[in-house]
Design a protein with these regions (language model features):
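N-terminal secretory signal peptides that target proteins for export/translocation
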Residues: 1-2
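Sec-dependent N-terminal signal peptides
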Residues: 5-14
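Sec/Tat signal peptide C-region and signal peptidase I cleavage site
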Residues: 17-21
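Flexible, surface-exposed loop/linker segments and immediately adjacent secondary-structure boundaries
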Residues: 22-54, 58, 67-182
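N-terminal Sec/ER secretory leader and immediately downstream segment
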Residues: 60-62
């Protein structure tokens, strides 16, 4: 009886994991050069991006990804990133977005998830974790645990009346707020 029950639970969880990993979460808006996913499928303009995908943007290549919550990710050459979590409710703009940049350069323009709840967008890098607070920023990371973070979008002294954003960088021990562009 116990073995049958455990087998049933295992099969059920396998189906849930399979359905989550095939959840459409965004689209490649622009693809230039050699861009593949973990299945070694070539990604082109209009290719769908799914929960759990790992994207590989090769040398002399770049891509722009548009997510359902209107987050825009511009991915530079020699970048590897994984979408660890993406949950979005378009009715309430609630959700969670976690990406892991193993190497390369990615520019973010945060979307509705971060605007509704800034703590719900997280970027993992070899050097630590970054939380975005409704802004535009760039992350450049290498596999040697070095990362550069640049705040691009409206800082506290902007003259356009825009709500200032910031990013928060943590290495697991220390936390730093980046509040001014540059």
């Amino acid at each position: 009886m116990t073995k049958k029950f455990l087998l049933t639970i295992f099969i059920f969880l396998s189906f849930i994991t399979k359905s989550l990993s095939s959840e459409f979460i965004g689209v490649i808006g622009v693809a230039v050069g050699d861009i593949n996913n973990q299945k070694n499928e070539k990604l082109i303009n209009g290719s769908k991006v799914f929960f759990g995908d790992t994207l590989y943007v090769k040398s002399k290549s770049n891509a722009q990804i548009l997510f359902l919550d209107e987050t825009v990710m511009t991915v530079g050459e020699n970048t590897e990133l994984t979408i660890d979590d993406f949950v979005y409710d378009p009715k309430t703009n609630d959700g969670n977005f976690v990406t892991n940049i193993k190497s390369g350069t990615v520019k973010f323009i945060t979307g509705k998830i971060s605007k509704k709840n800034p703590d719900n967008l997280e970027v993992k890098m070899p050097a630590g974790t970054l939380g975005a607070r409704g802004t535009e920023f760039l992350v450049s990371s290498n596999s040697d645990k070095e990362s550069t973070v640049l705040l691009l979008g409206p800082g506290p002294d902007n003259t356009l009346g825009m709500i200032p954003g910031n990013v928060q960088l943590s290495d697991g021990i220390n936390m730093t707020d980046i509040t001014k562009p540059g």
